Amino acid sequence: KAFAMRADYVNANPNATRALLKAVMEAQMYCEEPANREEVARICAKRRWINAPFEDIVDRMRGDFDYGTGRVVQNSPHQMRYWKDFASYPFQSHDLWFLTENIRWGYLPRDFDGKAWIAKVNREDLWRAAAAELGVPAAQIPKSTSRGVEKFFDGKVFDPANPKAYLDSLTIKHLRGQGAA
């Protein structure tokens, strides 16, 4: 999930920017509420959005999964998140991981300075201001710009303090100028 706006728009329209952010945040909070999941799934199932069977969408929103192997999980903690667990917060560590993945696949050069780019474009200050205007409790606002070290399902670890170590640990990648690895 990402929400991006051009810097020239943000600078020229600060009130509209905050209004847009607050509207998105309120929608995320609404979607997060279990009582609203069925309604949200019905909306998303429509042709103009996901165009998928309602049952397929609502089960995932509730955290009900049928893995097709006889393994069925209900009310999984791994259900779709919209607001809880800082799902909408623009963590700089997430930005760095996405940029690192773009380096991994050769879309950005290996020497790309992701941290400098993030410092220019990540506007978590706007998110925090919108959250404050909405009266979001402090417990729902991250204390850090980083989620810290992330461990993925395959056991790989991404430490935002050392993205090169993550890249070096990957066996499947294409790094520009180095051919397929």
Positions of PLM-derived features:
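Periplasmic-binding protein-like
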Residues: 1-13, 21
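Secondary-structure end/capping motifs
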Residues: 13-121
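Conserved C-terminal helix/tail region of periplasmic/extracytoplasmic solute-binding proteins
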Residues: 96-181
